[in-house]
């Protein structure tokens, strides 16, 4: 039933987005005008709420680092009047939109959204994470349009980008971003196309707080592993959030590769190291430990295992880890640098990667 609802919701979102956008028009000289949005526009957000925005938003509040990163990629940083807490600890702000560190207000976190600060920012569009969805109705009653985003898969990340693009009249930029996203995923598909299911390695992705926490089958990070040509070692565990495992479960999974993600903050470091995993006597018989295939995801930019627009780089990096002969870290570093230059307008230091 959940899958059927998701499919219907996706179809409704597509039609809603199409209805709000005027088509590209041939000007008669062979040039095609930039696609624009006609306001008022009505859309369906990612939990099924219908929202109407009467005029082009000029003051945006984003209560979620994922939607904030998407807004920066869409060139909307000048319209962000308030964002989630902790911006001074997220490298992407310093690299791509340092002015937000001085100008943007603080509306708290997904778990503790500050409604009063949000209202004080006088927004004409609010973007909320699913954990703060209850505030959407309150804002609607105050005539402040609010959408809820929940990008827990590649497809839902694309939907979020297109949704924000429609509501902010940045459809052309959103289309360019999605096209790049699909181009990079297509590159990975070509690299892994001839690899049989039996040849694909089992990958265990740790949590940042503990290596005894991992990614169940319905979590976004599981889709990164699959897209990169791997198999989630925890594919038999149900759920869509970080899940604790026992040593017995870890040993039973016996992954070929262990990945330690970055924590999305300035120091980028989780609460443990690869050496801690290698030194744990209860994990000594795991294949990844014996083969010394424990890898730290690069840090200092964004957490590439999260559903931000640059999350596609997480898939590329895992591909380089799993299939270095087909796609090297040097290849990845170039693709990552090109991505950040095009959509975040900064020159990436690739030394931490290669």
List where the protein language model places each region.
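Positively charged n-region of N-terminal signal peptides that target proteins for export
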Residues: 1-8
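Alpha-helical, coiled-coil/dimerization segments enriched in small aliphatic residues
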Residues: 214-242
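Bacterial lipoprotein signal-peptidase II cleavage site
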Residues: 18-32
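A short, structured surface patch at a secondary-structure boundary
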Residues: 62-121, 125-131
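Extracytoplasmic substrate-binding proteins
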Residues: 43, 49-52, 135-213, 234-236, ...
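Structural recognition of the beta-strand scaffold that forms the well-ordered cores
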Residues: 61-63, 79-84, 125-129, 146-150, ...
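Bacterial N-terminal signal peptides
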Residues: 8-16
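Proline-aspartate-enriched helix->loop->beta-strand connector
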Residues: 107-110, 114-128, 144, 246-263
């Amino acid at each position: 039933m959940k899958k059927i609802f998701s499919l219907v919701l996706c179809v409704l979102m597509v039609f809603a987005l199409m209805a709000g956008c005027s088509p590209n028009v041939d000007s008669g000289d062979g040039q095609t005008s930039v696609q624009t949005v006609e306001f008022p526009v009505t859309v369906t957000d990612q939990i099924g709420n219908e929202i109407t925005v009467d005029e082009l938003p000029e003051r945006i509040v984003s209560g979620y680092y994922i939607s904030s990163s998407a807004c920066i990629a869409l060139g909307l940083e000048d319209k962000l009047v308030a964002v989630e807490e902790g911006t001074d600890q997220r490298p992407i702000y310093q690299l791509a939109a340092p002015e937000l560190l001085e100008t943007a207000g603080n509306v708290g976190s997904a778990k503790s959204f500050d409604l009063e600060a949000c209202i004080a920012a006088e927004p004409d569009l609010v973007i909320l994470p699913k954990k703060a969805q209850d505030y959407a109705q309150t804002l609607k009653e105050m005539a402040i349009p609010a959408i809820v985003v929940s990008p827990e898969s590649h497809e839902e990340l694309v939907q979020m980008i297109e949704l924000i693009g429609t509501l902010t009249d940045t459809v052309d930029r959103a289309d360019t971003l999605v096209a790049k996203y699909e181009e990079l995923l297509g590159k990975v598909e070509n690299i892994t196309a001839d690899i049989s299911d039996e040849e694909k390695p089992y990958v265990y992705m740790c949590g940042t707080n503990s290596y005894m926490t991992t990614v169940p089958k319905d979590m976004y990070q599981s889709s990164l592993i699959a897209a990169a040509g791997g198999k989630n070692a925890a594919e038999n565990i149900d759920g869509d959030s970080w899940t604790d495992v026992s040593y017995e479960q870890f040993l039973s999974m016996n992954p070929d590769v262990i990945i330690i993600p970055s924590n999305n903050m300035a120091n980028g470091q989780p609460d443990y190291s690869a050496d801690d995993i290698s030194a744990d006597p209860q994990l000594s018989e795991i294949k990844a430990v014996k083969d010394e295939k424990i890898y730290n995801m690069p840090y200092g930019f964004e957490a590439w295992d999260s559903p931000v627009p640059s999350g596609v780089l997480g898939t590329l990096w895992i591909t380089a880890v799993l299939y270095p002969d087909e796609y090297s870290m040097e290849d990845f570093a170039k693709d990552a640098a090109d991505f950040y230059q095009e959509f975040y307008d900064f020159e990436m230091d690739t030394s931490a990667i290669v």
